[in-house]
C-alpha cells in the first residue's frame, strides 16, 4: 500500500489520521513539525503528504515551497487546516497544494479524499 507522510503538530489529530489510514492498509509516517521534512521525504519516499498549514516555526506554505524547490517537487501534498476562512482553499491551491482538507475532518470523507489524491485526482484551480 502507498506510504503517506503526515505533518501535523497536534498529537490527537496525528493519532486520528494515522488510525484512519492504517485501517485502510496504508503505511503512515508522522512528523510533528517541519523540522527534518526534506530528510524524511528522502528517507521514507512517501507517495502523498498531508500537511497542516498552521505549524510552529515554518508554516505549511513555506514547507510546500521547500518541497516544490526540491527533488520531490512532483509529490502530491494536501493542505490540512482548522482555520477555514473564505479564500483559504483558493490560496492553498494557488500556492501549489494538490488539495485542501478542513479540520475537524469528516471521518467518512477523509479516507476518500486521500484515495482520490493517491489516484492523481486534483481539484479545479
Spans of model-derived segments:
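Conserved acidic carboxylate
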Residues: 8
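Two-component/phosphorelay signaling modules centered on CheY-like receiver
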Residues: 11-29
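Acidic catalytic/metal-coordinating carboxylates
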Residues: 12, 33, 59-62
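C-terminal output helix
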Residues: 15, 105-114
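Short hydrophobic/Thr-rich beta-strand motif most characteristic of the beta2 strand and flanking loop
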Residues: 25-34, 39-40
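Short amphipathic alpha-helix used as the core "switch/output" element in two-component signaling
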Residues: 39, 61-73
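Active-site residues of response regulator receiver
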Residues: 52, 81
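The feature encodes the CheY-like receiver
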Residues: 56, 70, 85
Amino acid at each position: 500500500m502507498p506510504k503517506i507522510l503526515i505533518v501535523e503538530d497536534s498529537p490527537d489529530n496525528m493519532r486520528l489520521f494515522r488510525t484512519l489510514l492504517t485501517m485502510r492498509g496504508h503505511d503512515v509516517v508522522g512528523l510533528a513539525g517541519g523540522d527534518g521534512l526534506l530528510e524524511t521525504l528522502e528517507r521514507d519516499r512517501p507517495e502523498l503528504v498531508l500537511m497542516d498549514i498552521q505549524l510552529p516555526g515554518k508554516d505549511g506554505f513555506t514547507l510546500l515551497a521547500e518541497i516544490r524547490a526540491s527533488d520531490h517537487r512532483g509529490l502530491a501534498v494536501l493542505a490540512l487546516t482548522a482555520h477555514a476562512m473564505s479564500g483559504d482553499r483558493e490560496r492553498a491551491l494557488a500556492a501549489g497544494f494538490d488539495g485542501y482538507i478542513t479540520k475537524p475532518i469528516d471521518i467518512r470523507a477523509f479516507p476518500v479524499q486521500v484515495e482520490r489524491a493517491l489516484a492523481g485526482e486534483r481539484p479545479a484551480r
